[in-house]
Amino acid sequence: MASEQLSRRENITTERKIQNAEDSVPQRTTHFELRETHELGPNFQSLPRNENQAYLDRGARAPLSANVSESYLDRARVPLNANIPEHRVREKEDFGGVRDMGKFQMESKGGNKSLAEDRETLDTRSRMVTGTPHIKEASGKGQVVEERERARERAMEEEEKRLTMEEISKYRNQAQQSALEALSAAQEKYERAKQATNETLRNTTQAAQEKGEAAQAKDATFEKTQQGYEMTGDTVSNSARTASEKAAQAKNTTLGKTQQGYEATRDTVSNAARTAAEYATPAAEKARCVAVQAKDVTLETGKTAAEKAKCAAEIAAKVAVDLKEKATVAGWTASHYATQLTVDGTRAAANAVEGAVGYVAPKASELAAKSVETVKGLAASAGETAKEFTARKKEESWREYEAKRASQLQEGEEILPSTGGIGKVLPSGERTQAQGTNLQEKVQGKGSDILGAVTETVSDIGSSMIKPIDNANTKVKEHGGTTITPKGQDAGGVLDAIGETIAEIAHTTKVIVVGEDDEVEKSMQKNIGSDSHSLDRAKHEGYRAPKNNVS
């Protein structure tokens, strides 16, 4: 700490000295500049502008010489106005008057006597002032040189000041660093010395304690030995007395435990017997209940199996009946579809004939012939479409029936329902025969219905063909025209084609629905025969030609 205070005091003293020196130098420079400006200012202002500028330029370009190194005070004492031409002429003219010599006024006395002396003095002074060119240049460029010197001195002063401040800061930092290092070293040294002292003190204390403990251990050993001898004697006597007491207590305890064990064993046996009896009675009851429940379950299971078999048989019978009905419905649908197409074709032919009647007479025969061909084509197309549709529906119905039959029937036997409520097992042969008989009976019944419907359709077709032609003839007669009657084969060609088509449709429907059967075949032929007779009768009645074609 003392070293830091000393270094701070030295730094403060040095800084004060430097500041005083820096303050004194500018003051002196400013004093000389003011004096020179006051003395040389009027002379420079009296010069013409061109000469003054040329003089300053020449002084700025001229190199420094040895005479420039003289002081500012010596240059200030030289009267510069003596070099001006106007002043020289005025001095030559007025030798006897008062003249300015520098800063003093001089008065010449004696007139011509002193003329030579005055002129000689003036020449000498002129030579001194205007003697050599470098004096004039030095006197003219004094201000420029002064400014340069002043700037140079200022720069040097600033540089010295900057260097001085940097050195001061550097020395200060070094001193602080050295002080910190010395302080750290002293602190470390103190810590090491303190640690060594503490360790030595601890070792000494530990050694003293060990010596004291050894002495105490020796005394304690002696005391313990004495106490052990005394305690051994007391312990032996106490042990003998305690052993006798423990033996007496053990005897009493053994007797008590034996009595308690006997009583506990007797109670346990009686409780176990009573618990076994109590447990056996509910167990027997539970076993009896379980047996009864098992018996009931067995009976219920048998009854349930019989009922399930009965239900399965009923379901199978219902499915078979449904399939048969579906097959019959498919036959009905095909017959209805074929009949509808035939009726539509017949109506179209009748409409064509009716339109042809209303046309002019020369075209009547041609239109009738074309209508016959058109009706034949429509009838044939209707019959072919009905056959394909009926065949496809038959195959689909048969496949569905076979699939459901295979899924519902068991292998080799089937349970059929009976009036007694118990299922009856039938062999597969008898089952098939019975099903075939029932199927044949139902199909025959349905086939008769289908053929009856076909017969009615044939009658409707005949009526539909006759009515349009009668209406056409009636309209022609009302208008006073000529009725047209088909000739030869054309007269019955339309009705023949329709009759043949209907017969084929009926036969195909019968084969698809009920199969080949003699009784059904006879019934169908009978119905078709009656239909043919009725159709022929209608044809002859409707197309009976009048005696006179032209009315």
Swiss-Prot record:
Keyword hit for Mitochondrion: no
Region ranges (Disordered): 1-29, 197-265, 518-551
Transmembrane segments: none
Keyword 4Fe-4S attributed: no
Induction: Induced by abscisic acid.
Keywords: Biotin, Coiled coil, Germination
Biased composition annotated in UniProt, kind: Basic and acidic residues: 1-20, 533-544
Known function: May serve as a biotin source for several growth-limiting enzymes that are necessary during seed development and the subsequent germination stages, and thus may play some roles in determining seed germination capacity.
The family this protein is said to belong to: Belongs to the seed biotin-containing protein SBP65 family.
Annotated protein name in UniProt: Seed biotin-containing protein SBP65
Lineage: Eukaryota, Viridiplantae, Streptophyta, Embryophyta, Tracheophyta
